[in-house]
């Protein structure tokens, strides 16, 4: 579960390395899970890239350490909390996605992120 002040790694090549959650978007929501959109501040970024440190960005959560229960009864858990930066049209800002992503992103209409990911679990 991601909440305010949580740190996430960035799973794309937009230029940001780590982000910190400022707000979970939605009607007064406290926690974010896989597929939820958050507002975050860039805490660590690569030089000479489009995303700069201390920039406020939107991101979609693609992996969480918290166990994700599926309707089939399966549960899945990742090794890290990760997000992909998105623009206003909900398209990824980077051109590559690193690491596996959860299948729930396809149900939330983030098909571009799913198609860029090397593995969908």
From Swiss-Prot:
Pfam families documented for this protein: Ribosomal_L14
Entry keywords, A to Z: Ribonucleoprotein, Ribosomal protein, RNA-binding, rRNA-binding
SMART domains for the chain: Ribosomal_L14
Tagged with keyword Transport: no
GO MF annotations, alphabetized: large ribosomal subunit rRNA binding; structural constituent of ribosome
Keyword Aminoacyl-tRNA synthetase: no
A GO cellular component annotation in the UniProt record: cytosolic large ribosomal subunit
CDD domains in the record: Ribosomal_uL14
One biological process term in Gene Ontology: translation
SUPFAM superfamilies assigned to the protein according to its UniProt record, in alphabetical order: Ribosomal protein L14 (SSF50193)
HAMAP family xref list: Ribosomal_uL14
Subunit structure: Part of the 50S ribosomal subunit. Forms a cluster with proteins L3 and L19. In the 70S ribosome, L14 and L19 interact and together make contacts with the 16S rRNA in bridges B5 and B8.
Similarity section: Belongs to the universal ribosomal protein uL14 family.
Purpose of the protein: Binds to 23S rRNA. Forms part of two intersubunit bridges in the 70S ribosome.
Record-linked PANTHER family: 50S/60S RIBOSOMAL PROTEIN L14/L23, LARGE RIBOSOMAL SUBUNIT PROTEIN UL14M
Record protein name field: Large ribosomal subunit protein uL14
């Amino acid at each position: 579960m991601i909440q305010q002040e949580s740190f996430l790694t960035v799973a794309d090549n937009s230029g940001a390395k780590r982000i910190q959650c400022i707000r979970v978007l939605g009607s007064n929501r406290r926690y974010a899970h896989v597929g939820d959109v958050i507002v975050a501040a860039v805490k660590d970024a690569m030089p000479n890239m489009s995303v700069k440190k201390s920039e406020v960005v939107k991101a979609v959560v693609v992996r969480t350490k918290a166990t994700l229960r599926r309707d089939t009864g399966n549960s899945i858990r990742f090794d890290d909390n990760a997000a992909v930066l998105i623009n206003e049209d909900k398209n990824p800002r980077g051109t590559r996605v690193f690491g596996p992503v959860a299948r729930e992103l396809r149900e939330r209409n983030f098909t571009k992120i799913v198609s860029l990911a090397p593995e969908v679990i």
